[in-house]
Every structure is written in structure tokens, then in C-alpha cells.
Amino acid sequence: MAEVSEEIRNLAARHQELQRQAEALRQEMGMIQTSISSCDQTIVTINELKAASEAGKPAETMVPVGFGSYVYAEVKNPDRIIVNLGAEFSAEETAEEAIETLNRRKEQLTKILEQMNASLTRLTQGMQTLEAEAAKLQPGQA
């Protein structure tokens, strides 16, 4: 009986560890999803600014000036975009190039998200396996 109790404790400890890993993975997945949404929104904004400029309208936007405050500004050249390349490097690109860069980044993030989702599935299956093992060990559950 003591062996069964010890085995159940071991299964519970392994289950808790898998739960912690799954929660950490879910948080990372949320951050990746936020980045994908940010790419989408940036592409929409670039297209809107470009369309306004091509229609002869002023391309207006709000520019953050700090502490949740913004000013309205007119974009003088909406076809030139400064794109973050990572590692604190940026490059000036045309609007089309910037959209291509953002779409590539989005594809990479989507692949990472798919891999993370597969990992989450494996963790969930591992937890279910541990739960089934624990149920077999408990008296009156067989």
C-alpha cells in the first residue's frame, strides 16, 4: 500500500510539472499570437497610408509622444517604412518591401506557433496518461 501511495505522489509531481510547462507554453503562445496580430495590423496601416497618399489625400496618423499621449501628424512619404529587423537593427524599405518582410515574419511566427501547439498537445496527452495511471492505482477505481 505504501508503494502505491508513493507511486501516486510521483505521478502527481510529474503531472504538476507538465501543468507548469503547459502554462508557460500557453503564455509564450499568447505572446507569439500578439506578434502575429501586430504584423497584421501594421500591414493594414501601411496599406491605408499608401492608399490615402495615392488618392491625393493627406496620409494622417497619430504619433505617440509618451505616457499614453498622441499627436496627429501627416506622413510625408508613406512609401518609405523603417522596419525593425531584430537585434536592434532597422532598415528603410518601400511599403511593398515592408509588407513582404512583415508577411515573412508572420509566416515564421505562425510556424513557431504550430510547433508550440503540437508541443502543448503532447503535454496534454502526457497529463492524461498520468491521470489514467493514477486512476488505476487508486483503490476502488480499477
UniProtKB/Swiss-Prot annotation:
> Which gene is the coding source of this polypeptide chain?
pfdA
Question: What organism is listed for this UniProt entry?
Answer: Methanosarcina acetivorans (strain ATCC 35395 / DSM 2834 / JCM 12185 / C2A)
Subunit info?
A: Heterohexamer of two alpha and four beta subunits.
CC per GO annotation: cytoplasm; prefoldin complex
Q: Name one GO biological process term.
A: protein folding
Major place of residence: cytoplasm
The GO terms this record gives for MF are: unfolded protein binding
Top-rank lineage group of the source organism: Archaea
**Name of the featured protein:** Prefoldin subunit alpha
Q: Which UniProt keywords apply?
A: Chaperone, Cytoplasm
InterPro entries referenced in this protein's UniProt entry, alphabetically:
PFD_alpha_archaea, Prefoldin, Prefoldin_subunit_alpha
Localisation per UniProt entry: Cytoplasm
For this chain, the family text in UniProt reads: Belongs to the prefoldin subunit alpha family.
Q: Summarize the protein's role.
A: Molecular chaperone capable of stabilizing a range of proteins. Seems to fulfill an ATP-independent, HSP70-like function in archaeal de novo protein folding.
Q: Name one Pfam family in it.
A: Prefoldin
Where exactly are the transmembrane stretches of this chain?
none
